Amino acid sequence: MPQLAGKLILAGLIPLGAWVLHGFASCNGLIQMFEDFGKQTVLSDGVTDYTGAFTGLEGLDRLLRTLLNFFWPVANGHDWALSLHAFMFAGQGVPLLVLNMLEGARPGNKSLVVSYVTVFGILYMVVGLAIMAPLYLFLHLLTSRTATAPSKAKVAVDPNTAKAVGFGVFVGYVLPTIFMSLPHPSLLSTDTKVLSVVFWQAVPLWASVCAYFASTALGQSATSRSSSNLPSALGAVYAASLIIATATHVATFAISANLSDTWSGIFTFLIPPNPFNTDMRISSFLEGATWFLQWDYTMMSLAYMVWAIGIRHGVEVPRSSHHFETLGKIALRSMAKLLVMGPIGAALSLVWERDQLLWQLDSESGEKGEKNRSRRMSRKWMFS
């Protein structure tokens, strides 16, 4: 029942995400500004010249110019509220990529549409997380065997694959994000800064490519499914992702508290405007980019929290078991995690819990089976 509710919520978030992201942007004037900047050789700050030709393919270059103009103020710290939001968003990007890439590697998702995580990652960047995140997660709950009938065998990830995912996210996402954020012209020339922002648009691809080569070099581990404990490599990837997500989330609010005069002001940078007020107009491109990013983050967060709670509750546990938790208790714990780790960090934590629970249940089932076999052998010996 909770997963059915999750599917319905996620299905409803898809058109809502389309409106708050693109419909609202069209009404408030941001889309028109995008189109205007796409025709110019000056970036969205109004002063930086650039060529705008990156690949020689006009259609692709037009898309890259649009993304570049959007992320240019984000990468340059032109506004403290936008910079804070982008910093927090970037931190949540680590568990986001880890979650998706691990889903692509799970046996229960093999050959399913949700295993094509690189394609979905690019669509996240191009179409927007507010639309593509609920769509991907809806398809996951609908089709994935790790969601419909979870078991240790279906969610098990080879330890070396887990290491490769961690390596891929660090080299393909974390490093490009840090490099893109370096100031110009003090550390980066304008041309280098522009190219770094353009390069960053394909971080889901770079992360997947790096993970592929790392996985090929490491090979397959022989202990991925035979161990009675969750592989330490997988746990290490989960833990590292949560450390980054938590550190950036807490640091964001600490900085905001230092910059704000009131308690309510701490959360101002996070709260998006009413998307159904079609009379609202942006006063600048910077303001429009901030609103866009706020809604992208909000919808993504809601989608992943709904999905993760459904995934965690989807493990069948008898009510008599000490592992059993009600949906309400899981939801309350999830909200507490969200406050500390951020939404995607909380979602990853719930998936980690799910994995650990499946390993424990499998181990207990094996021990129970071994005891039953021992009893049968004892009876057979007594009456022989």
From Swiss-Prot:
Changing D61A: Leads to significant loss of activity. One of its GO terms (molecular function) is isomerase activity. Its EC number is 5.4.99.-. Ascofuranone is a specific inhibitor of trypanosome alternative oxidase (TAO), and quickly kills African trypanosomes in vitro and cures infected mice. As an essential factor for trypanosome survival, TAO is a promising drug target due to the absence of alternative oxidases in the mammalian host. Changing E103A: Leads to significant loss of activity. It is a multi-pass membrane protein. Epoxide hydrolase; part of the asc-2 gene cluster that mediates the biosynthesis of ascofuranone, a strong inhibitor of cyanide-insensitive alternative oxidases and a promising drug candidate against African trypanosomiasis. The first step in the pathway is performed by the non-reducing polyketide synthase ascC that produces orsellinic acid by condensing acetyl-CoA with 3 malonyl-CoA units. Orsellinic acid is then prenylated by the prenyltransferase ascA to yield ilicicolinic acid B. Ilicicolinic acid B is further reduced to ilicicolin B by the reductase ascB. This is Terpene cyclase ascI. The lineage of its organism: Eukaryota, Fungi, Dikarya, Ascomycota, Pezizomycotina.
